[in-house]
Amino acid sequence: NDDGSETREYPEGEVFSHVVGYAAKGKSGLESSQNFNLLTSNAFFLEKLANEFKDQKNTGDTVVTTLDANLQNAAYNALGDNKGAVVVMEPSTGKILAMVSKPSFDPNNVSENWDALNNDENSSLLNRATLGQYTPGSTFKLVTTLAFMRQNPDYNNYSFECNGEFSQNGATIHCYNSTAHGEENLTDSVANSCNSSFSNIGLQLDKAEWRKTAKQMLFNSKLPGDVKYNESSFRLKTDAGDADTMMTAIGQGETQVSPYHMAMLVSAIANGGKLMKPYLVDKITNYAGTTVMKYMPESYKELMTSSEAAQLTEYMKAVVDYGTGAALSGASYTVAGKTGTAEVSEDGNTVHSWFVGFSNVDNPELAISVCVEDADTATITGVSVAKQVFDSYYNN
């Protein structure tokens, strides 16, 4: 500015606010992690010298992100006025293509609105994508399924007769709307998101081995990447009773997870079991556009074998082909995924609606994790948000 002061301008406003962050009142997001690069000038030495003689500032470097503006806008618009988060990753590289959290805020006037933002009961400054901790609901059945596969090599022979509810030692779990799914194998159990079948599966699991599988899926673990996050938690004890065990198997109970973590999990499944380290910065360029630093994809670790990933993909395809994610079938693109409806109130009327999965199943392109808080599922679901994001990518 003319008076020597500096102002940060955010032309994209609320759409990128959590992931880009703000530079006032402390820093957040990329403004925090990339502050050094933004202030460093990789101009040529003689130019820097000339500028100093003229009392002119050297232009700081430019941080080029991995974010796809169209996907970011699509995710932002798809959430509408709902609270929640969307994370989109490229499974083969770990590039974060979109990261949206709502409610949002305008980073252009954080200083002026600081007190109101800090006292906001909707926590609009909170990046729900990485810091939000949610009951995973039926998306956690992917972990339960993997644990069952590992403990039961003959899992293809699994059979269960669902009559809409399952009781054990005084504890009863109901299927959604108490729907009786009839005779099911493991594929059907995942596709129908059958709570009764998964309660039965949970009771058959060795809890210590189950916990081990959950840890390998990054629960109770550090997550890769450079964003601030909260660790997800799997708390089922080895001496837990039947009720807690059944609830945990279907993704209720005390398990907590972030949308960021679930994006990594489905990204690894899409990538043959191998998780690529998530990253947000593609390159750093100087004022002339010359690249001074380029970030390359990095493998983080193998979460599961390629055959386990392929089997989970088959189950997730069934979810879309004839199960709870059928609203995503018949599009110009293919999807494999898992839905979730997490009850978060005593009366069961308040739910978080989830969808996790990936598109272009034979050569995966987009891994997505959606959580809609307190969703009115008559008007919005995790599936409907994911569909809008996929549609914007494949139909434009």
Identify the residue ranges that each predicted region occupies:
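Beta-lactam-recognizing serine transpeptidase/beta-lactamase-like catalytic domain environment
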Residues: 92-138, 143-374
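Solvent-exposed, polar/charged alpha-helical surfaces in well-ordered, non-transmembrane soluble domains
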Residues: 4, 8-21, 28, 32, ...
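A short acidic/glycine-rich loop-to-helix N-cap element
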Residues: 372-385
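Short, gly/Ser/Thr-rich active-site loops of penicillin-recognizing serine hydrolases
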Residues: 291-296, 384-396
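Extracytoplasmic/periplasmic proteins that interact with beta-lactams or build/remodel peptidoglycan
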Residues: 1-85, 99-100, 104-128, 133, ...
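Short hydrophobic alpha-helical segments used for membrane anchoring or interfacial signaling
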Residues: 86-91
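Intrinsically disordered, low-complexity acidic/polar segments
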Residues: 28, 365, 377-379
